[in-house]
């Protein structure tokens, strides 16, 4: 789903006002659901979620938090719903055998770093994580899902995008009214700079919540000066295009697709033909690459990024406290 343009406009936009009553009902139901008590996993649970629908950087944040957990001497495992995959789980993700159509794209990325479990039933997924030897569970998404109790929930916010018009879906991008989400959050991770993210950070600080600034950092690449046709099926493809431009790539065309888009053969053929016509290389994201057939992916460049925190030690201290570590 591509977010409608009016989500980024003010709350007085005619479409937002027209959908306001429906958003109020949806938001009230979502908020009531969030307040339900969850089952205990038997080990600490850290949740990387977001206030809004769409991409904010939860998966890079989950990877970075899991790395900090491992540095503290714990054994993390990832737990995901597996959005876009057909398997209900619980199942351990095996990148050598599973496809994105089965388990979703993000779990395939997570499973490269630590055991990853896909489960629509989060408590059952947590039990499988424990059986795999995990003593800390890192949830990729699930802030609004109450079925599993969390020891620390960090809301990931895209700095440039912020929270849009601040209204609940479908009038805006919020998954529930913001005032009802704050009590479930223990801190923020704000990725990138922007007025929207700054406003959310100030609201968090007024509530005494820690705010962790972060940025996406490119892994080593040799894209400078290369003609690139960029394609991506992610929440905010413009972030990907901007990162490519920062790498010095010459972007001769872009092809945005919906988030989690399953690429069809005719679409891939059209991409290959467009790249040939433009005398360009195809470039995409890691998340898109795992959704491509292996033979096609072999001819596509992948831009790899990681999340770097402005003050990793501050986040490490907060995680240590959530784990009950000395």
From Swiss-Prot:
One of its GO terms (cellular component) is plasma membrane. Transfers the gamma-phosphate of ATP to the 4'-position of a tetraacyldisaccharide 1-phosphate intermediate (termed DS-1-P) to form tetraacyldisaccharide 1,4'-bis-phosphate (lipid IVA). ATP binds at residues 52-59. Keywords: ATP-binding, Kinase, Lipid A biosynthesis, Lipid biosynthesis, Lipid metabolism, Nucleotide-binding, Transferase. It comes from Methylobacterium radiotolerans (strain ATCC 27329 / DSM 1819 / JCM 2831 / NBRC 15690 / NCIMB 10815 / 0-1). One of its GO terms (molecular function) is tetraacyldisaccharide 4'-kinase activity. Belongs to the LpxK family. It catalyses: a lipid A disaccharide + ATP = a lipid IVA + ADP + H(+). Pathway: Glycolipid biosynthesis; lipid IV(A) biosynthesis; lipid IV(A) from (3R)-3-hydroxytetradecanoyl-[acyl-carrier-protein] and UDP-N-acetyl-alpha-D-glucosamine: step 6/6. The keyword RNA-binding does not apply. GO terms for biological process: lipid A biosynthetic process; lipopolysaccharide core region biosynthetic process. InterPro entries: LpxK, P-loop_NTPase. The keyword DNA-binding does not apply. Its EC number is 2.7.1.130. It holds the Pfam family LpxK. It is an enzyme of class 2 (transferase). This is Tetraacyldisaccharide 4'-kinase. It comes from the Bacteria. The lineage of its organism: Bacteria, Pseudomonadati, Pseudomonadota, Alphaproteobacteria, Hyphomicrobiales. SUPFAM superfamilies: P-loop containing nucleoside triphosphate hydrolases (SSF52540).
